[in-house]
Amino acid sequence: MTQTLSHLENRDAFIERHIGPGVDQQQEMLRTVGADSLDALISQIVPADIQLATPPDVGDAATEFAALAELKAIAGRNKRFKNYIGMGYTAVHTPPVILRNMLENPGWYTAYTPYQPEVSQGRLEALLNFQQVTLDLTGLDIASASLLDEATAAAEAMAMAKRVSKLKNANRFFVAADVHPQTLDVVRTRAETFGFEVIVDDAPKALDHQDLFGVLLQQVGTTGEVHDYRELISELKSRKVIVSVAADFMALVLLTAPGKQGADIVFGSAQRFGVPMGYGGPHAAFFAASDEFKRSMPGRIIGVSKDAAGRTALRMAMQTREQHIRREKANSNICTSQVLLANIASLYAVFHGPAGLKRIASRIHRFADILAAGLQHKGLKLRHATWFDTLCVEVADKATVLARAEASEINLRSDIPGAVGITLDETTTRADVQALLRVVTGEDATFDIDALDKEVAHDSRSIPAAMLRDDAILTHPVFNRYHSETEMMRYMHSLERKDLALNQAMIPLGSCTMKLNAAAEMIPITWPEFAELHPFCPADQAEGYLQMISQLSDWLVKLTGYDALCMQPNSGAQGEYAGLLAIRHYHESRNEGHRDICLIPSSAHGTNPASAQMAGMQVVVVACDKQGNIDLADLRAKAETAGDKLSCIMVTYPSTHGVYEETIREVCDIVHQYGGQVYLDGANMNAQVGITSPGYIGADVSHLNLHKTFCIPHGGGGPGMGPIGVKAHLAPFVPGHSVVQIEGMLTSQGAVSAAPFGSASILPISWMYIRMMGSQGLKKASQTAILNANYIASRLKDAYPVLYTGRDGRVAHECILDIRPLKEATGISELDIAKRLIDYGFHAPTMSFPVAGTLMVEPTESESKVELDRFIDAMLAIRGEIDRVAQGEWPQDDNPLVNAPHVQRELAQEWEHAYSRELAAFPAGFENKYWPTVKRLDDVYGDRNLFCSCVPMSEYQ
């Protein structure tokens, strides 16, 4: 038969590449689960009243090459001016060895958050290095493994200051007037929900105010002035005020550490350590504090512990602080950090070392001195007598200066009254300084850079002597060893080999959607057209970005059934927070600000109650029935009791228990009946796209995890993106921005992130995914994800009971395996199974969430039947091993499960176990064996002996 041209063009090629099971495999799986077709299976699972007749129209699929060409043309509309705007964002040189071997390497970017430390030692070591950089530069005792951005870190510092303050009746927070405006914006948003009064004034005036629990200072002010705050900090601390200082990683290479001056908390952005501006992100924030406050720290902390053999091993420490455990009592709602970006920054420090960093920082400062001298020789006045990299130049005719700058394709900071700001960076050259001198002075002349250099080299007073660092930094061998590209390449590869990522095996984590992050989706994020833009550049320079964001927003609006979308939240938890703020402000606009009760099902993810608490709401828990569904009678009773105080409900769909609840529309109706709003958590959107939608179901607002459903990689624990979709009545209440006005979004609300579009530079990933899949491909992806989950459930249900099912015994896109009966009978726990899976070459499913003693499995649509069968066979083999324990063949305290995982070293030692070496290490055969480098971690030891900085190199041998 003659094939049509359309068939030969194969525009659907990417759909077949993204979806793991081919047509034949799908048919085999459908036979196993007892369904005639994908459509028939979906009709058995998804309630008929919420099924869409046709998938939302986001266009037809495009090939990888057509989509890349289309996006390249859009990116070409961006204008790549030289940016000297500053305000916490600068141009960088990402070392090519890091770009190629890490940022563009799926062994790094497809890994998950290191909750399973035995398969995460590589990136845990890189994160520990990041913490060491933070400790050395800030002069404090304990550091986190990154936060979402600098402004969010400031808000977290304020919240932490209140938590640890001994002045329990104090409710005022002072912010120095020269912090970055976007930082102040996010602090004010957070303070409003906490009921804090924010005072903004010149830093010394903090002493004039009473009832302060905290003060926020910035070491290098937003217009460039270098501050020596040691006396002010000393006086504030004598009054028991918690002092936070915003700082800059590169400046700290030369400047004295704020911790040495008495600061309690120091934070800032690590962006200029090798991470491009990317129109606002993603970037890692650093955060450090005094040891006495360690258990009140937000975010993740990497600690040094021991494994079962007593060898040094790394893990995430003090996890009981996190929202997964403490829910509404958590220190923060932070779930995603910025691991990939923190690791770029940490490796940047490793590659350059202390001498290289000092050379870069000194060069930046020297160019600033040269520029200052050249301007002063021409009669121009500098507003400040001190600076590191930023000059505030007073100009009589600012409009003319800015016009000359624009004509020269240069961006200066323009929002300072009577002055322009110029921030230099590591990319600055002599030619750049020449161009800046011409633009600002208006003289078309050649300036003698060498003469200016000689003038300033021996008489620089722009950094006061008291502010110059006098201690050594980064003395640990890891920062002094890998400076050739060969050594650096091998070091990064040695770290990568320790970890298990999607490039080696499926990661079946429930509620995490570890799907394919296709190479074609990743390519655009390193294009300079996207990477080099400053988030506060003029809009006409970002037309490509704005077009791409507008198209992506339109597609997501259609796919969610909402009316508007806000891209600003840079994690799912921040999306929850932003959505709840929209609900709060909506009620306030109707003179119903008293509505503050948030109903949350008992099965909810821990971020839900933590976010509700952050948004100033009271959490009331709604019971679930024996089938895992929301108990409608309890919901009605709780809604009626709340009455006119009901603000909203937070509900996940399909439920966190892995089923499509038949009564979801009734849930929405009950809440609406009592005047509440419905927040539908988008964590499980991968089971909705093209089949149903939150808006069609009846919800008012949702966040979308672009790092789950829409293919942004997890990066080993970040970046994430959590944009919110809203119905029209909530659109005026989504986050705004004080620096950049967001076109088309009628909102006067405060910001929740530093940049107006959050982590804009990773949005091309989701744009590419939707463009290459098209309407039908997206629907088929959801259908296949559901098929894969039901295939696993069908094959494993006799060995491990499936805890919750819907109609006809079906599950949604994930299933919960109940390990409790096995544990009761044999003593083998879900933890033992999780660790034994490592020996079989798999990352464990989600443990003990949402039900203790269970494993939650989510295969996604990207895994083929071959890989699913490999996982199923491993689980069945493990069940056989459990049976051997039950039958007494192996002791309960000496079997391959309780001793798992097994490492190479122990195979070479004397073997005294009741099972063979081969069964221990090669239960699935000898091909493509993954070797963990440590045995099971001792969590108790790690938390009781908290150590969160680099260990001697000998410990890694």
From Swiss-Prot:
| Alphabetized InterPro entries for the sequence | GcvP (IPR003437), GDC-P_C (IPR049316), GDC-P_N (IPR049315), GDC_P (IPR020581), PyrdxlP-dep_Trfase (IPR015424), PyrdxlP-dep_Trfase_major (IPR015421), PyrdxlP-dep_Trfase_small (IPR015422)
Keywords, ordered alphabetically: Oxidoreductase, Pyridoxal phosphate
Which Gene3D superfamilies did the record assign? Answer: Aspartate Aminotransferase, domain 1, Type I PLP-dependent aspartate aminotransferase-like (Major domain)
Q: Which GO BP terms sit in this record?
A: glycine decarboxylation via glycine cleavage system
Residue stretches in coiled coil: none
- Which top-rank group of organisms is this from? Bacteria
Name the Enzyme Commission number(s) assigned to this protein: 1.4.4.2
GO molecular function annotations of the record:
glycine binding; glycine dehydrogenase (decarboxylating) activity; pyridoxal phosphate binding
Keyword flag Oxidoreductase:
yes
What GO CC annotations are associated with the protein?
cytosol; glycine cleavage complex
Annotated catalysed reactions? N(6)-[(R)-lipoyl]-L-lysyl-[glycine-cleavage complex H protein] + glycine + H(+) = N(6)-[(R)-S(8)-aminomethyldihydrolipoyl]-L-lysyl-[glycine-cleavage complex H protein] + CO2
Modification sites for N6-(pyridoxal phosphate)lysine: K708
Q: What does this protein do?
A: The glycine cleavage system catalyzes the degradation of glycine. The P protein binds the alpha-amino group of glycine through its pyridoxal phosphate cofactor; CO(2) is released and the remaining methylamine moiety is then transferred to the lipoamide cofactor of the H protein.
Question: How does this polypeptide assemble, per the annotation?
Answer: The glycine cleavage system is composed of four proteins: P, T, L and H.
What family does the Swiss-Prot or TrEMBL record give for this protein?
A: Belongs to the GcvP family.
The protein, known as: Glycine dehydrogenase (decarboxylating)
State the organism named in the record: Cronobacter sakazakii (strain ATCC BAA-894) (Enterobacter sakazakii)
